[in-house]
């Protein structure tokens, strides 16, 4: 998603003048040197309308919290942006939490909303995310993910290739909480929980196992949601959907760990290679499909708000490019690492995965 918009140029040196929030070049300075004062506002955020955006990483929002109760925490809880499809296709959004110099969250808006290949089918949405404008025109992606922090947050945007002219619009919002514990579904999270985005982009060999998420030992947490997108040049078509999801807690747990699905489409609450077509439901969605002689594209998402996937000492969440069936008829698929009968010709020439995981350090 690239932007380089020229409607208004605010790329600047100061984040605010007389209460008006301006853009500035990312400088990785510590929070205590920022021009914004610590705040105890219960609701905070910003909006930028028709601004320029370049290949330079640009701060669009920064916020600091006044010290308060030990149970106090803050959240970023709303993201929305819109622009032309050409610009959106080059955009990266980053969240730097509590003085980070490497962002724990960096996303492309469509993949954050569970959509691969910039599929602009619209409108649709759930309480967590969606797209309100698109259909090949200007797109408007949003999510309401709860991104906790205790002291500070900084949000930046950046075009990853040569920017294109046009207007970029963004709205960011958050809130401060004193005693109301953050809950994801039925799971209450501690004040020091952080949301981390684990990502992968690249090829996989047939039957290769991908760590969609890999959280080291010494950490507890909760898998919130994930997105998977796969394409190939037609070889094997959708045979990669035979791949099974597993979890390992701790990460060194022996195979098969805990089996989370009996095939890829099964994990997304479908079956038979998604024979009923695309869907976008509160828990899971099948958001893109293109199957041609020389091209296969597919993407889907799933949340774990209703069926928490928790871990207590590190975590691996894995997916395999295709799978094999044991030669023992009593075992079936998903429980054989090698030596079985491969189902079809699974081909994963390019894979992108996102896993949003809440993580907090174990108590000593």
Whereabouts are the PLM-identified features?
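Cleavable N-terminal signal peptides of Sec/SRP-targeted secreted and luminal proteins
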Residues: 2-19
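Beta-strand-centric surfaces of beta-sandwich/beta-rich domains
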Residues: 18-364
